[in-house]
Amino acid sequence: MITLQRTPLFDVYAKYGGKTIDFGGWELPVQFSSIKEEHEAVRTAAGLFDVSHMGEVEVKGVDSLAFLQRVVTNDVSTLKVGGAQYTAMCYENGGTVDDLLIYKRGEEDYLLVINASNIEKDYEWLASHVIGDATVVNVSSEVAQLAIQGPKAEGILQKVVSEDLKEIKFFKFKNNILVDGIPALVSRTGYTGEDGFEIYCKSEDAAKLWEKLLEVGAEEGLKACGLGARDTLRFEATLPLYGQELSKDITPIEAGIGFAVKTNKEADFFGKATLKEQKENGAPRKLVGIEVIERGIPRTHYPVFIGEEKIGEVTSGTQSPTLKKSIGLALIDVKYAAVDTEVEIEIRNKRVKAVVVPTPFYKRSK
């Protein structure tokens, strides 16, 4: 029997009606009320997520920048203290090790936030490529992460923070600020397509912070949210999920995150040659949006056809709570990736008609 890992918030899930599942070796809440209710709360008011299963790795030292430039695809030299950057790590063949966030806390002090299912793999990958005077330390067990997301997130969080949150712009953060007296790193980032904040604190402070935020946010409609809504929200916003839109067999260019790949930076990073070729001449496959015209919901790995030719497969799909449509993301042969191309998806041994549509499916009005 495999023992599932738990976050520091596990003991408070039941109080809020949390229903847990095995997610990549973690026992996490898939929902508290219903996925639809939680999804709509984030789109219209605010939702609070426990994302403490995510991994955190500290990179420090004189050679920390040179090291990061070698192992990630984005240009870390453009990052200023107090800034966050979305990036990827790739294998030499261009396949993706992981996608991640980098926070620059000091001139020689970076915090990397990596996917939960990849913590061990990523840490080993980073540690095995360390250069010079750079250190890599896995601090995942010491750090908890809460995400408060939605149009009312700022107002709710402001109740327990003395600093003016309006000063924290998108993809910026403040370190060591007090949230209801608890020291935390607060960043204006998220994985929902809405405005919001991610809060990093010590593991032992997480439960108190969770309870306080739900208490002060109750009148604005703040809801505890699980992984189910997190997935439908990120999917509508077309934010990739490692293991579905990204993998060791899928490059960042194919997955549509080429903006996080800077092949013109001086450093020779892993995968640079392949990614440069794909950026300049196009990748063989492309991640596209698809809308099912007939009955049926596209799910991960369902094959996509044109006639008798299999042109790719679905990476994620659902009945969109916001758009009320059956939509999916599919990685397909680039020849067929134009919007309005008619395709078929095999759903339970039956072909159903679908069409390529623009992405993102959902974009918030600013």
Swiss-Prot record:
Entry keywords, A to Z: Aminotransferase, Transferase
Classification via Pfam families: GCV_T, GCV_T_C
Catalytic activity as recorded in UniProt: N(6)-[(R)-S(8)-aminomethyldihydrolipoyl]-L-lysyl-[protein] + (6S)-5,6,7,8-tetrahydrofolate = N(6)-[(R)-dihydrolipoyl]-L-lysyl-[protein] + (6R)-5,10-methylene-5,6,7,8-tetrahydrofolate + NH4(+)
Any one of the GO BP annotations: glycine decarboxylation via glycine cleavage system
Top-rank lineage group of the source organism: Bacteria
EC numbers on record: 2.1.2.10
Gene Ontology molecular functions: aminomethyltransferase activity; transaminase activity
Gene Ontology cellular-component terms listed: cytosol; glycine cleavage complex
Function: The glycine cleavage system catalyzes the degradation of glycine.
UniProt subunit comment: The glycine cleavage system is composed of four proteins: P, T, L and H.
Family named by the database record: Belongs to the GcvT family.
Protein name: Aminomethyltransferase
Organism: Bacillus cereus (strain G9842)
